[in-house]
Amino acid sequence: MPAYKRVLLKLSGEALMGDDAFGINRATIEGMVNDIAEIVKLGVQVAVVIGGGNIFRGVAGGAAGMDRATADYMGMLATMMNALALQDAMRHANIEGRVQSALRMDQVVEPYIRPRAIRQLEEGKVVIFAAGTGNPFFTTDTAAALRGAEIGAEIVLKATKVDGVYTADPKKDPSATRYTTITFDEAISRNLQVMDATAFALCRDQKLPIKVFSIVKPGALKRVVLGEDEGTLVHV
């Protein structure tokens, strides 16, 4: 029995790279889509916000010295490419995915319209939110917090390469331990970088919990949705 009815899944662009230097690793994206398919079959409504670091990192050298707003718009376009790749992989897995973009690109994707997004979720479609918030200076983490609040998600699932929030960097400190649960205020006071400050504040103010878990760990997403001990829960 799922612990949540509607979730917002935040995928980083870097997670799509797999072991590649940049770009989209087909096997990796197919694995993610299979994980998403499993929770859709449980009756969970799934919305996705995707980053663009895997593509933008490939051109980041050329962005040195670039105006921040211009670089951010390039990043938004990178998320659009990832969203289309994710939608295509879903089609092959017989899941209906719909991309809604915060930037208008009408020949390619639908614009973001909140009531339509909610209706599509209720119809069992996976809604993929592209182009972040549509504004520069805001991260895709902030977009995840914003869209999660807008669609009435019960939780933001932040998929990373680490299986939760630790007392210290587990790669540098072998004695670091994983938090099972932690409050927003504790995470702030201990300077734990769960999300960027804007996204974190938005989730805290809206009382929207965050679950940090590993997307590369087999079956982790399903265990999170079933309410099992997986990852770290950040709550009010």
From Swiss-Prot:
Keywords: ATP-binding, Cytoplasm, Kinase, Nucleotide-binding, Pyrimidine biosynthesis, Transferase. GO terms for molecular function: ATP binding; UMP kinase activity. CDD domains: AAK_UMPK-PyrH-Ec. Homohexamer. InterPro entries: AceGlu_kinase-like_sf, Asp/Glu/Uridylate_kinase, Uridylate_kinase, Uridylate_kinase_bac. It is an enzyme of class 2 (transferase). One of its GO terms (biological process) is 'de novo' CTP biosynthetic process. Pathway: Pyrimidine metabolism; CTP biosynthesis via de novo pathway; UDP from UMP (UMPK route): step 1/1. Catalyzes the reversible phosphorylation of UMP to UDP. It comes from Cupriavidus pinatubonensis (strain JMP 134 / LMG 1197). Belongs to the UMP kinase family. It is found in: Cytoplasm. GO terms for cellular component: cytosol. ATP binds at residues 10-13, 53, 57, 160, 166, 169. UMP binds at residues 52, 72, 133-140. This is Uridylate kinase. PANTHER family: URIDYLATE KINASE (PTHR42833), URIDYLATE KINASE PUMPKIN, CHLOROPLASTIC (PTHR42833:SF4). It comes from the Bacteria. Its EC number is 2.7.4.22. Inhibited by UTP. It catalyses: UMP + ATP = UDP + ADP.
